[in-house]
Regions:
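Acidic/polar-rich alpha-helix caps and helix-coil junctions
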Residues: 1-71, 103-236
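Periplasmic/extracellular electron-transfer cofactor-ligation site
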Residues: 29, 97-98
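Domain-scale macromolecular recognition modules
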Residues: 74-76
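Short, cationic low-complexity segments
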Residues: 78-94
Length: 236
């Protein structure tokens, strides 16, 4: 109809993918955003609580009047580190990654340390490679697969009117890259999409350049992109 697909110039399925690729590329180009670096991702004071170079769109809790109560606040729900105002630390209702998803993240992917490995859970000291505000005693309480992605505001574990004040990610540029890759698989072919996915992963997420998409058709390419969306945007 004139108010729907016709108005967008879409007459076939592939037109949808062409538009998706075009809009995703426009968002990348016009936002001025860059994928998060490893240091931004793992920053103990600002990691996933303060907008940075990759965030296109956010919501903000900037005052205690906006906050109301930690119990139903964003940071109170998703953070694992505070025993004063998070459901994880206070109520033991930790937000965890599923084991089946975690097991699909290779060691070469630096995002893997976002979650507590089963072999590291319960240790008396914080194992190497993790970014956390906790000391050994706090670490020992974390169950396997607990997330360390969302740090309290300003890295404050004790004052809810500081730790629960934060920015909330609604859209990051990484999602635009992944939308673009999935879309061009339909318009330019699987090999073209694989090349862009390989380049993205090795430039921004792998430490050794070893990522290589093994997709052989549209379905397996979509599965590869979906896996990266699940890892990259976990909890968002």
């Amino acid at each position: 109809d004139a108010d729907g697909y016709d108005a967008l110039g879409i007459t076939a399925v592939n037109d949808c993918f062409a538009k998706a690729a075009s809009y995703a590329q426009a968002a990348i180009d016009n936002s001025g955003c860059q994928p998060m670096s490893q240091s931004e991702w793992y920053n103990k004071k600002t990691g996933f609580n303060t907008a940075n170079s990759s965030w296109i769109w956010k919501a903000s809790l900037g005052t205690k009047e906006q906050l109301g109560s930690w119990f139903y606040s964003w940071m109170g729900t998703v953070s694992s580190e505070s025993t004063a105002f998070s459901m994880g630390g206070y109520g033991k209702a930790y937000r965890m990654i599923g084991a089946s998803l975690y097991n699909q993240i290779p060691d070469a992917d630096w995002r893997k340390k976002t979650w507590v490995a089963p072999e590291d859970a319960g240790k008396a000291e914080v194992p190497a490679g993790y970014s956390t505000l906790l000391d050994g005693a706090g670490w020992a309480k974390l169950p396997a697969y607990t997330n360390l992605k969302y740090h309290p505001g300003s890295g404050n574990l004790s004052d809810l009117y500081v730790g629960c004040l934060c920015d909330i990610p609604l859209m990051r540029v990484e999602e635009m890259y992944l939308i673009y890759i999935e879309a061009i698989a339909h318009t330019e072919g699987v090999d073209a999409a694989k090349t862009v996915l390989n380049d993205f992963m090795n430039a921004y997420r792998y430490t050794d350049g070893s990522y290589e998409c093994q997709a052989t058709d549209i379905e397996s390419l979509e599965d590869a992109v979906l896996l990266q969306k699940r890892i990259e945007l976990w909890g968002e």
